[in-house]
């Protein structure tokens, strides 16, 4: 029996969930501080009591749009469902929650599943078992939103979980090469997208291009994609309305290259819509 089976109760690691905060409006530099949009309030006590990973950030539809996966697929990963008269438990959540809100940790873990979904059908049962094993061993509800499984000392745990769950090679996160544990290409691509703070995923690069400065972070623009704190959607709207790139860059105190990156990212979203 794998060393991962230690009888831990995964429910003990689960934290209370809190509701998402209001969305912030991006304004050009020079906007008066008493502008109503600047005075939007946020329940900071709620933000403080919920961990970053457990914070509800997006509607299910918005998360699916940002991940560029069908909403039905994301819902299947989050809450499970039925396929050919067989009921499947969730892959990401411990239990179905029945709502349409997505936490930051759930979004990040769905980003990992997306890396595998590009070329394969995600095996629900095996991945569920695999994540359950990591959840039990690490004592956290969302183990793949933590850095530990991906660094050298945590890869042995991942290897054991892969073996114990019967996960096929196409879906493995680590592989043994010349006696060393290395990340598989999908896992490595995922890790490169994440900004780690300590052990947790504190940021995410939604753009496929590794050079892109577009980032998502739960404490910046309420998790929406941004460049240097300015929403890419807002920048795209200004350009779409006919404003010049240099004009928009100057208004938001950004480099022209930042605007180009924001447009490139937004164009991928609009193309996938």
Task: Please tell me what each predicted stretch does.
Residues 92-93:
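An extracellular/luminal cadherin ectodomain-centered signature
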Residues 7, 19-21, 30:
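Residue-identity detector for glycine
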Residues 31-34, 38-76, 82-87, 97-101, ...:
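Long, charge-rich, low-complexity intrinsically disordered regions
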Residues 3, 9-11:
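Short glycine-rich, low-complexity segments
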């Amino acid at each position: 029996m794998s060393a991962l089976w230690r009888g831990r109760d995964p429910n003990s690691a689960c934290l209370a969930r809190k509701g998402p905060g209001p969305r912030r409006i991006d304004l050009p530099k020079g906007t008066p501080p008493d502008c109503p949009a600047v005075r939007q309030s946020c329940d900071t006590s709620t933000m403080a009591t919920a961990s970053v990973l457990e914070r509800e950030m997006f509607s299910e539809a918005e998360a699916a749009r940002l991940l560029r996966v069908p909403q039905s697929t994301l819902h299947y990963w989050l809450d499970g469902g039925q396929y050919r008269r067989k009921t499947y438990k969730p892959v990401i959540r411990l239990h179905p929650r029945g709502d349409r809100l997505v936490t930051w940790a759930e979004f990040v873990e769905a980003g990992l599943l997306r890396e595998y979904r590009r070329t394969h059908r995600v095996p629900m049962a095996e991945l569920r078992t695999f994540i359950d094993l990591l959840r039990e061993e690490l004592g956290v509800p969302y183990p793949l939103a933590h850095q530990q499984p991906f660094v050298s000392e945590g890869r042995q745990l991942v290897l054991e979980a892969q073996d114990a769950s019967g996960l096929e090679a196409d879906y493995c996160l680590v592989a043994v090469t010349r006696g060393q544990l290395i990340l598989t290409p999908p896992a490595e691509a995922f890790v490169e997208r994440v900004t780690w703070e300590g052990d947790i995923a504190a940021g995410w690069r939604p753009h496929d291009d590794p050079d892109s400065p577009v980032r998502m972070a739960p404490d910046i623009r309420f998790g929406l994609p941004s460049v240097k704190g300015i929403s890419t959607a807002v920048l795209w709207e200004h350009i779409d309305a006919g404003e010049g790139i240099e004009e928009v860059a100057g208004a938001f105190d950004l480099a022209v290259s930042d605007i180009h990156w924001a447009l490139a990212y937004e164009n991928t979203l609009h193309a996938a819509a």
